């Protein structure tokens, strides 16, 4: 369960940015992420919707913006909601609707969605398995990715399937102590409490 008391959108955005810089880019979990971040082409949006329908309206808006904006101006979007999806099961159920939104906005084959959640868990793993941290984030997050960007990045990383295996091996080598040393706000290993001074 996510403790989201006393949060504001600026704090949520900053925590997400630190996760992006320290884990996704810092550990090179996604080799494609650094370039757009350095070029300031990553949009972080914190939804304040009070219900699912409102969140899906925010998703529609961000999908349309991404679809109508050149990649040279906006490469990718992180849509974050700190309170609406407190458990992974609820979040996971929403993903099918989110994928439908891509189709409804006529962006199938153009944009895809990658999910991240504080309690993300791959099928067949234990909750505290370090491999789950490839997709764990401070808050429930939808990463809206241009498929053209993925194809372009794949040219530089032809063995893209090896990235996941490399990430798992890296996290297993780091272990929970190594992960916690990254000091990512609201994203500690399960048996640790989040730092109160974040």
Question: What is the meaning of each model-derived region?
Answer:
Residues 2-198:
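Expand to "…catalyze enediolate/carbanion chemistry for C-C bond making/breaking, isomerization
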């Amino acid at each position: 369960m996510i403790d989201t008391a006393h949060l504001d959108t600026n704090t949520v955005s900053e925590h997400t940015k630190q996760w992006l810089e320290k884990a996704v880019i810092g550990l090179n979990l996604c080799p494609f992420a650094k370039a757009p971040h350095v070029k300031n082409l990553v949009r972080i949006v914190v939804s304040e919707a009070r219900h699912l329908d409102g969140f899906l309206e925010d998703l529609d808006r961000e999908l349309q913006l991404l679809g109508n904006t050149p990649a040279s101006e906006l490469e990718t979007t992180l849509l974050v909601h700190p309170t609406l999806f407190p458990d992974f099961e609820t979040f996971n159920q929403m993903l099918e609707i989110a994928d439908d939104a891509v189709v409804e906005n006529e962006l199938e084959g153009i944009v895809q969605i990658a999910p991240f959640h504080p309690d993300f868990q791959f099928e067949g793993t234990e909750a505290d398995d370090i491999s789950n941290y490839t997709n764990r984030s401070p808050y429930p997050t939808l990463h809206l990715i241009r498929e053209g960007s993925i194809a372009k990045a794949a040219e530089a990383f032809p063995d893209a399937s090896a990235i996941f295996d490399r990430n798992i091996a890296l996290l297993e080598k780091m272990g929970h102590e190594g992960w916690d040393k990254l000091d990512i706000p609201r994203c500690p290993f399960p048996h640790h409490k989040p730092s109160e001074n974040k």
